[in-house]
């Protein structure tokens, strides 16, 4: 059987918690000045228990999880890596400060693309808290094994 950089059904996850200091720091770093991310009083007046995270924060963490996972070698030590080619993220509920959030991806398909010297992986993912789904996502990645001789065109 040919060695593959991933398998359909492969899942990976990470639990994170965004603190009340982390949320405004990230929002400022991406120039998101919405006061719901910076001002407790404004967030409470809007009906939230406190600060809510910028969508870019939890979305970027979910996307980064794919990069981290596929940069890890296979169980037999074979190096692998990948690049994100596209992500579609749908926000379902706000992310509150200081709640546990489970980020999860599952590979749904893998197709060899000789022109790109790799495989196109399709993934489905989400972020959940005890309140339910916070966001859902799909992703398309280019994966490869070993070291690349040249960057894909």
Q: Model regions: which residues?
A:
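HotDog/MaoC-like acyl-thioester-processing domains
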Residues: 1-11, 94-153
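A generic structural signal for short beta-strands and their flanking turns/coil linkers
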Residues: 10-14, 22, 79-87, 101, ...
């Amino acid at each position: 059987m040919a060695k593959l950089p991933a398998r359909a059904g492969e899942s990976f996850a990470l639990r994170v918690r965004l603190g009340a200091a982390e949320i405004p720091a990230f929002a400022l770093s991406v120039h998101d000045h919405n006061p719901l991310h910076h001002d407790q009083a404004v967030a409470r007046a809007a009906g939230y228990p406190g600060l809510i995270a910028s969508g870019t924060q939890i979305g970027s963490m979910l996307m980064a999880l794919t990069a981290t996972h596929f940069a890890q070698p296979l169980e037999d030590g074979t190096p692998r890596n990948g690049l994100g080619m596209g992500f579609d993220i749908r926000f379902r509920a706000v992310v509150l400060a200081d709640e546990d959030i489970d980020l999860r991806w599952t590979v749904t398909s893998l197709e060899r693309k000789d022109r790109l010297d790799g495989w196109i992986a399709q993934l489905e993912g989400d972020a959940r808290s005890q309140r339910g789904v916070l966001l859902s996502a799909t992703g398309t990645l280019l994966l490869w094994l070993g070291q690349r001789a040249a960057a894909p065109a």
